[in-house]
């Protein structure tokens, strides 16, 4: 009886187990390949010694066509390194801009050309500036949202965001203005408002190790996540050194940098921080105006005030400068043999500093006058004869640079003129600028040469007989424009051949090459023989100079009728 009862119970258990297995197999067969809790694909790679894993619960091949929202798979990125705990919460954080889907687009698509962002192509939410991804504890939050059948059966749009409101860094200063918004936020106002909210229930756990299943898990109600992790920094691998802690930086100035008002301007409105003069020590009263401050004052003010060693953006003490000098009338140099009035030597020295046309004078006691000196070697170096037709000398004929026979009625354009060409270089070795004597509004414009003539007679060119000293050729008055062609080392070019800046600076040269118009003497009617070439600069002494005995150059000329040679060029008194 007992044996029969036991065998009956055993048979019932066997049939019950078979029935359970059969029912479970029938229920698992329809969804056998779509278990969302099973990882079906695994991709592993190694970067800098760290192993990363990408897991996918979906199938490897996805058929074409719209996919149902129930068949969405999960993707998980594991193996991100654990952030070191030593990094402070105030360290700079990395921002990540996820892509927001447009209506009718799959969440993985990006829109090129519609919104550019420093993080790459794609849509950016309106709060991308105020959200930080990740923190020093190695935790991050993400959310997922699945839009169900937008626009009547279109593909489901998936948006993944790694932004979390709990990790927003609150500034330590009071907020006076709202956060600035990106200019392209208005393009996406038709989004689902639910996609802009944050799901506080989703938590992404970063694993402690680098293995595949080392505790990496994601729990989401929607079942579709894209936990994008920021790239690991160098110090997170243990190879970096301890970084200094810096205060957090936001869109507004940190409280550690308070506003400093600018210093008040000096009373006279002049910046005297770099006004030290190399010539001030030689003037009388320098020690009284600039007493020796001593080492204590130098340390207090940052250096010797006489040398302008003041801290940046600071005004020097007003007592370090002497009182301003009263403006004196300009000194007009005139040649007079009258005796100077009492105290005239002192007054003349002070007036000479403001002399007309005086710019550079190392000697403060001199009046400052120019001194023109022609170069005899330059004239002798390249003197030659040129034959040219009259039609090619029309510009020179307008300026009266030819002999009188060139203007005769019987002269034709095919007549040949013989020209004695030579260069000229004049140096101003004085202590003041050589300026034109004519006012600027009276300068003469020559349209053929396209420049202004600021002087009527700058040079005279004459050819004299070597035996008698008489003129054998009709020279002319060269009225070129004055300019600084070249300058000695340490001198700057300040004048040019323009309508308002003509002159000759001290230490500079006004050069006229032998191939320019009017740099010649017309010797068409001169017979071969020995002659003297005379070049006279500032011939009528209209502009006052410090020395008039060095303005003339004489050269011995031997003319054969075919060529010419110049010898023994030197400076003479007249």
Curated annotation (Swiss-Prot):
GO terms for cellular component: acrosomal vesicle; basement membrane; collagen-containing extracellular matrix; extracellular region; extracellular space. The modification 2',4',5'-topaquinone is found at residue 512. Its EC number is 1.4.3.13. It is found in: Secreted, Extracellular space; Secreted, Extracellular space, Extracellular matrix. The record marks 95-96, 134-135, 151-152, 216-217, 337-338 as: Cleavage. It holds the Pfam family Lysyl_oxidase. This is Lysyl oxidase homolog 1. Residues 1-25 form the signal peptide. The lysine tyrosylquinone cross-link (LTQ) is generated by condensation of the epsilon-amino group of a lysine with a topaquinone produced by oxidation of tyrosine. It comes from Homo sapiens (Human). The gene is LOXL1. Cu cation binds at residues 449, 451, 453.
């Amino acid at each position: 009886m007992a044996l029969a009862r036991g065998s009956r119970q055993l048979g019932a258990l066997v049939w019950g187990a078979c029935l359970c297995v059969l029912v479970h197999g029938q229920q698992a067969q329809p969804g056998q390949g779509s278990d969302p809790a099973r990882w079906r694909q695994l991709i592993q790679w190694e970067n800098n010694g760290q192993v990363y894993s990408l897991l996918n619960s979906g199938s490897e091949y996805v058929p074409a066509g719209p996919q149902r929202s129930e068949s969405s798979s999960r993707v998980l990125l594991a193996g991100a390194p654990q952030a070191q705990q030593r990094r402070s919460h105030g360290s700079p954080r990395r921002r990540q801009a996820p892509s927001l889907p447009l209506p009718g687009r799959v969440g993985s698509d990006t829109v090129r050309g519609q919104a550019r962002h420093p993080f790459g192509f794609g849509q950016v939410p309106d709060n991308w500036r105020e959200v930080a991804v990740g923190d020093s504890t190695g935790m991050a939050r993400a959310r997922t949202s699945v839009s169900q059948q937008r626009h009547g059966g279109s593909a489901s749009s998936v948006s993944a965001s790694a932004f979390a409101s709990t990790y927003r860094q609150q500034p330590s200063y009071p907020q006076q203005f709202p956060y600035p918004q990106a200019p392209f936020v208005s393009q996406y106002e038709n989004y689902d408002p639910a996609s802009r909210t944050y799901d506080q229930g989703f938590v992404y756990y970063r694993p402690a190790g680098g293995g595949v299943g080392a505790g990496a898990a994601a729990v989401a109600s929607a079942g579709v996540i894209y936990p994008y992790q920021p790239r690991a920094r160098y110090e997170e691998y243990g190879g970096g050194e301890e970084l200094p802690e810096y205060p957090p930086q936001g869109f507004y100035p940190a409280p550690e940098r308070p506003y400093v008002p600018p210093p008040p301007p000096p009373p006279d409105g002049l910046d005297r921080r770099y006004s030290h003069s190399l010539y001030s020590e030689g003037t009388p009263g320098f020690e009284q105006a600039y007493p020796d401050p001593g080492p204590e004052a130098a340390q207090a003010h940052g250096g010797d005030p006489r040398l302008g060693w003041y801290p940046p953006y600071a005004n020097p003490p007003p007592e370090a400068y002497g009182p301003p000098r009263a403006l004196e009338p300009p000194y007009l140099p005139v040649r007079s043999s009258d005796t100077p009035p009492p105290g005239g030597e002192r007054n003349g020295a002070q007036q000479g500093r403001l002399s007309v046309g005086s710019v550079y004078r190392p000697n403060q006691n001199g009046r400052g006058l120019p001194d023109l000196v022609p170069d005899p070697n330059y004239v002798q170096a390249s003197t030659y004869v040129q034959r040219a037709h009259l039609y090619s000398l029309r510009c020179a004929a307008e300026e009266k640079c030819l002999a009188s026979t060139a203007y005769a009625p019987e002269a034709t354009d095919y007549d040949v003129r013989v020209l004695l060409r030579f260069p000229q270089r004049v140096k101003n070795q004085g202590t003041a600028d050589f300026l034109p004597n004519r006012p600027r509004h009276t300068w003469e414009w020559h349209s053929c040469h396209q420049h202004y003539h600021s002087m009527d007679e700058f040079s005279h060119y004459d050819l004299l007989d070597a035996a008698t000293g008489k003129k054998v050729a009709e020279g002319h008055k060269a009225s070129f424009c004055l300019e600084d062609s070249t300058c000695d080392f340490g001198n700057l070019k300040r004048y040019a051949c323009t309508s308002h800046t003509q002159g000759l600076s001290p230490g500079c040269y006004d050069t006229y090459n032998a191939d320019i118009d009017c740099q010649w003497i017309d010797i068409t009617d001169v017979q071969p023989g020995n002659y003297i070439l005379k070049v006279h600069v500032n011939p009528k002494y209209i502009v006052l100079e410090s020395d008039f005995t060095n303005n003339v150059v004489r050269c011995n000329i031997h003319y054969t009728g075919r060529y010419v040679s110049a010898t023994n060029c030197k400076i003479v008194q007249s």
